[in-house]
Amino acid sequence: MESTLSLTIRSQWLERHDDEHKIRRDDHRSPFQRDRARILHSAAFRRLQAKTQVHGNSLEDFHRTRLTHSLEAAQLGTGIVAQIKKKQPEYRDLLPTDSLIDALCLAHDIGHPPYGHGGEVALNYMMRDHGGFEGNAQTFRIVTQLEPYTEHFGMNLSRRTLLGLIKYPAFISQTRAASQPAPVSHQRQIKAKQWSPAKGIYDCDKALFDWVLAPLSETDKQQLNAMRDCPHDALSHRKTRYKSLDCSIMELADDIAYGVHDLEDAIVLGLVTRSQWQEGAASQLADCGDPWFEKHISSIGEMLFSGQHHQRKDAIGGMVNALLTSIDVKPVDGEFESPLLAFNAYLDIGMEKALSILKHFVSQYVIQIPQVQIVEYKGQQIIMDLFEALSADPQRLLPLPTRHRWELAETDTSKMRVIADYISSMTDGHAQRLHQQLFSSHH
């Protein structure tokens, strides 16, 4: 059944929204090689080099940016696919090509606004009555509409690539909490936790989302839209339950890059100490249920904090390899007709626990610490100030192409969306410079 399904589906998943007739001589590339090239050459991708992954206050240029993070995720993604092909050859025809998984990993962060989570919270607050703001929803919007590779359809990527980029296949109106906190009297008072965005696709992008899902049966569409258990209170967002096989591989690559490579950054930047590692991660990894971690955890700690670059690299490489090689493709716990949805890639249970310990450690000791949060808070204020100014007098302050889009937008909500699109596309430095131009008497 699976093989016939994959054969009947295949050609539709290669289609593009706009059927192109490009003037290209002897172009032998596959659709996914083209998709990868479009992403790689896009302005949105290049801007990732000026968006920081972990906001420390180090003077060194060693730290990872969102661009280097995406390159590492892509390397991990192709590594995951290669080892599944070896271990489970029966899934060879279903697995993404190297170009496809590469494309997904390279593109997965391009919707992230300046100043990371701080920027996301700021834009979500400012857009609270206009459909919200969320990084993954913005990624979908950039690749399907905003990146000017085509006139109307963004990068005009193939359908399977777009499906792979959709981590949360539901509309934000469906995942958003039943009620939202009261708006604050002054934006300095906003609490980031209360305004973290619901995950999903913007409701205004429904036509494009529907186009991506068009090859699926009605039952598959409904099932893909399913939520996890109901949230415990009216202020908690709902979470989607399913995603495509390609997306599950991309997400694992992203998580490993975050949990392991961002840990390396933190050690080098001096954000974490050996005793914090021992208490916050090593002690739990020692009994996470995975024999590799249980056996090697003490030598990993030695190497990570040895002060020797090559030893630290060896430890990081060992952890990455242990995680990669414990990933398998399995049927999902839901009835899907399309093989792209019926299977996902999973870490085995011990390694899943290990990765969640590492991610929690990075979050607690690297992301949530005051020196990082101060930079995020400042970024949050910069973004809200910019939004307030630009939305107060758009025809005066927006750059001409953006102003033109704003004038063409027919409703208040779509006008606000144009402003959110503009601000979210900025790099950290661009946002800071514009803020100085608008508000600093010293500029």
Curated annotation (Swiss-Prot):
Keywords: Hydrolase. Residues 66-259 form the HD domain. It comes from Vibrio vulnificus (strain YJ016). This is Deoxyguanosinetriphosphate triphosphohydrolase-like protein. It comes from the Bacteria. The keyword 4Fe-4S does not apply. NCBIfam families: antiphage_dGTPase, dGTP_triPase, PRK05318.1. Coiled coil: none annotated.
